[in-house]
Amino acid sequence: MSIKIKSMLILLILLTITLVFSDTFQRLKELYENTKTIKVSFVQKVKYEWYPKADVSKGIFYASKGGKVRIDYYSPDRVSIFVDRKKVVLVNFEEKVVYIESIKRNTSPVIASLFFLSEQPEKVFKPIGEFKEGDKTVLLLKPLKKDENVKEVKIYFSKDGEILGLKTYDAQGSEISINFIEVVRNYTPTDELFKPSIPEGFKVLRYE
């Protein structure tokens, strides 16, 4: 599973969790339940245990209840990712390659439970703690099932209960952090937003 695909699925985890592990997040639950569509501008950093310099990407995340998801990375490379309950489609505009991967190839128990098998979040994650970092509230979660891709997750909230971002760690010590720059809820998507298209002349690689 590529870093970008794994990072995208980590975002899905964030948007799937209802986060009702304490009264502090009751308002967040209500906000989540009233959200039909969401658009998030974000900055993503990936730090590897074996490499000192972080990989930094910028992009926009779109999602609609019912499993429609799109991510457009525009820096440093232009990459678009589409996902539904059957496949993941990654369009790399720099390499002129389209990767199509079956959901059946997914190897993450956390991702499978939350997104593909629609398990309730409280059956997948265990809350470890809740603490303050400056004016932010941090919720620490660990998966109930052993998962090499997701060892623990930190989710950051403002004092108003808005999600500011998250950090996740894998078994090898790598860290993915995603900071939310702008969040728009309940917009009206175009009919084409969640439909992947293969640009003319691009090579197509399928992994079924």
Curated annotation (Swiss-Prot):
Keyword annotations from UniProtKB, A to Z: Signal
Signal peptide span: 1-22
SUPFAM superfamilies linked: Prokaryotic lipoproteins and lipoprotein localization factors (SSF89392)
UniProt-listed Gene3D superfamilies: Lipoprotein localisation LolA/LolB/LppX
Transmembrane segments: none
Short name of one Pfam family: LolA
Keyword Cell membrane on entry: no
Entry-linked PANTHER family: OUTER-MEMBRANE LIPOPROTEIN CARRIER PROTEIN
Listed name of the protein: Uncharacterized protein aq_1483
Organism: Aquifex aeolicus (strain VF5)
